[in-house]
UniProtKB/Swiss-Prot annotation:
Pfam families: Leu_Phe_trans. Belongs to the L/F-transferase family. Its EC number is 2.3.2.6. Its main location: cytoplasm. GO terms for molecular function: leucyl-tRNA--protein transferase activity. One of its GO terms (cellular component) is cytoplasm. This is Leucyl/phenylalanyl-tRNA--protein transferase. It catalyses: N-terminal L-lysyl-[protein] + L-leucyl-tRNA(Leu) = N-terminal L-leucyl-L-lysyl-[protein] + tRNA(Leu) + H(+); N-terminal L-arginyl-[protein] + L-leucyl-tRNA(Leu) = N-terminal L-leucyl-L-arginyl-[protein] + tRNA(Leu) + H(+); L-phenylalanyl-tRNA(Phe) + an N-terminal L-alpha-aminoacyl-[protein] = an N-terminal L-phenylalanyl-L-alpha-aminoacyl-[protein] + tRNA(Phe). GO terms for biological process: protein catabolic process. Keywords: Acyltransferase, Cytoplasm, Transferase. InterPro entries: Acyl_CoA_acyltransferase, Leu/Phe-tRNA_Trfase, Leu/Phe-tRNA_Trfase_C, Leu/Phe-tRNA_Trfase_N. The keyword Lipid metabolism does not apply. HAMAP family: Leu_Phe_trans.
Length: 231
């Protein structure tokens, strides 16, 4: 078994994702901080943090990788009917900190501790992290957040407090992202929720090839301006 790399506090270098462990799947390195510079370096190499508040930062690059490829979004018949009469309206970058906070309150979001929240807040302030909000009667009832890397978007977490709210956030964002030149949506690890929307697994090596291809490209102007999205 290959040893876990301890990150150097004075360097933002990461080992190559191919050096990640197979068990636990994708564990690559430990330590470092959650500064915007380190997080940015990680995402540009296909690496993301995931750890409990009681742990040191753990850095991952799993194989396979879950993605949604343009044109492969799946919207079931029941959800399609819901979208035609949705009571929600959806925005971009109107309430980033609230979205992260609500994601952290989910049972599955217990890994989103204070350090994680502060780290992504810094990325948001530098224009690299973004949120999508779902509103109902002036209350946020769903949303998602993630990190933009060129024309690739790395989804981090989503939450829903009303029926289909997180799916509405994802679908509205998917169309918005593609209209602005988006080329790939990274879902990291496949789960039932993302699979129902059309996510599939691809080899990590293939994902890294996409990443290298897309990370230095630019989206069309205006993608991340505060705005209302259409479903």
């Amino acid at each position: 078994m290959m040893p876990i790399i301890q990150l150097n506090a004075d360097s933002y270098d990461f080992p190559h994702p191919k050096e990640a462990l197979t068990e636990p799947n994708g564990l690559l390195a430990v330590g470092g901080d959650l500064s915007a510079k380190r997080l940015n370096a990680a995402y540009h190499q296909g690496i993301f943090p995931w750890f409990l508040p009681s742990e040191m930062p753990l850095w991952w690059s799993p194989d396979p990788r879950a993605v949604i490829i343009p044109g492969e979004l799946h919207i079931g018949r029941t959800l399609r009917r819901f979208l035609r009469n949705t009571p929600y309206h959806i925005t971009v970058n109107h309430a980033f900190e609230q979205v992260v906070h609500f994601c952290a309150q989910r049972q599955e979001g217990t890994w989103i501790g204070k350090d994680i929240q502060q780290g992504y807040k810094k990325l948001y302030q530098t224009g690299q992290a973004h949120s999508v909000e779902v509103w109902h009667n002036e209350r946020i009832v769903g949303g998602l957040y993630g990190v933009s890397v060129g024309t690739l978007f790395c989804g981090e977490s989503m939450f829903s407090r009303m029926e289909n709210a997180s799916k509405c956030a994802f679908i509205a964002f998917y169309h918005h992202f593609l209209r602005h030149g988006g080329e790939l949506l990274d879902c990291q690890v496949l789960n039932h929720h993302t699979a129902s929307l059309g996510a599939k697994e691809i080899p990590r090596e293939e994902f890294i090839q996409y990443l290298y291809q897309f990370r230095n490209r630019s989206l069309k102007a205006g993608c991340w301006l505060q705005q209302v999205l259409e479903l």
